[in-house]
């Protein structure tokens, strides 16, 4: 999955991916560190879909990423509501662009809730997003994390615990991030570490939920949690 950076309309992301010979790509559909996002300009969605067809990028090989501000596990009800509203906007935008996947970080309890309660809130948030985008084919894709602080998803089992509480199972999936896995303690610099990750993903989550992979280098050593 090649992460594309671009300026101007979102259709430029397709051109950027094609220029480097990517076969799949990820992108942000809005500024990743602000809550506000302008609507798509007229014609941009049609341009995006036409360029995807021209360069042979089917929807399942494009993985847009959610804002870093979104936190479905937040102990702050106001922030959770803003997060849900933002995700609904993003899911609608995905549908306008003909996309079928939307990647998010599960969130953080900020040290004020139990992990069990955080997992429940994430699943509840996903369920609300699904209900508010009824009839959409866009999946919420949960990404594994690096076990930093109170973030959820560093333990692969937590991803499955969230999925277990999601009502529309056909609209949820998982993205496996190799940098996050390395930071969480899987030493992917060795065959043994890679094998351990694969075995634990199979037993704790299940390959049937995997819809994307972020293949990233890690600046820190295994288990650095960053």
Positions of predicted regions on the chain:
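N-terminal pre-domain/capping segments
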Residues: 1-64, 70-92
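Hydrophobic faces of well-ordered beta-strands that scaffold small-molecule active sites
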Residues: 1-4, 23-27, 60-66, 102-104, ...
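Active-site beta-loop-alpha junctions enriched in small/polar residues
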Residues: 3-7, 30-32, 66-69, 107-109, ...
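Short, flexible micro-motifs
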Residues: 11-12, 110, 188
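Short amphipathic alpha-helices and their capping/turn segments at secondary-structure boundaries
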Residues: 11-19, 41-57, 86-95, 123-131, ...
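Active-site acidic/histidine proton-transfer and metal-coordination neighborhood
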Residues: 72-173
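Gly/Pro-rich active-site loop or hairpin
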Residues: 81, 113, 152-160, 182-226
